[in-house]
Amino acid sequence: QIDKIKNWVGKGNTLITIARGSSWAINSELINESLVESKKDSTYTRKRYVDAREHIGRERIGGSILSADLDLTHPLAFGYNDKSIPVYKNNNVFINKTKSDYSSVAIYSKDFHIDGYISDANKKDYVPRSASLIVSKIGSGRVIVFADNPNFRGTWYGTNKLFLNAIFLGNNISVPTN
């Protein structure tokens, strides 16, 4: 199935992925991008089973508002006038900034935390190294990769224009190489 999708995109088509779909595209090697990896702790400490739910839950992002820095010259940013854009993040999908200098459309701002709970580990280790929106090239086509859901419940209007631009302008976006 991956080869069929890769072949279809490579013929000049556009695929749009959102959140866990973006994670799937990276993990299945559909696109040549990567997720931000956790820093490995070389010391092993056994943890009590009874604490698992609390420890794992602490790292989840249930709903936070983060600030992203938008490249206003990119076609996906058509119609935006301010490079600072609030994005709603309710997942732990952290996508590395692209290898191409021109394809990280929205990266999280230096002072990214606007509102909502986000753990210290996510603040320090993940978000600063991540992009909210990238474009990845496959042959003559492209995959538009959203780390966050730009259409969250139909209530988050600040980023849905990015999604509409992906739909209507996607086939006209080229991915310059360095």
Which sequence ranges carry the predicted segments?
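Short alpha-beta junction capping motif
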Residues: 1-25, 140, 146, 166
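Active-site-proximal structural scaffolding
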Residues: 1-2, 9, 17-18, 61, ...
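Generic recognition of flexible, low-complexity loop/linker segments
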Residues: 3-5, 54-55, 63-65, 90-93, ...
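Residues that flank catalytic or metal-binding motifs in active/ligand-binding sites
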Residues: 20, 72, 132
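Alpha-helix capping/termination and helix-coil
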Residues: 9, 13, 29-32, 80, ...
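Proline- and acidic/polar-enriched loop/turn elements at helix boundaries
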Residues: 20-21, 37-38, 148, 178
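Extracellular ligand-binding/catalytic regions of CAZymes and related secreted enzymes
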Residues: 81, 85, 101, 107-178
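An acidic, glycine-rich "communication" segment
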Residues: 23-115
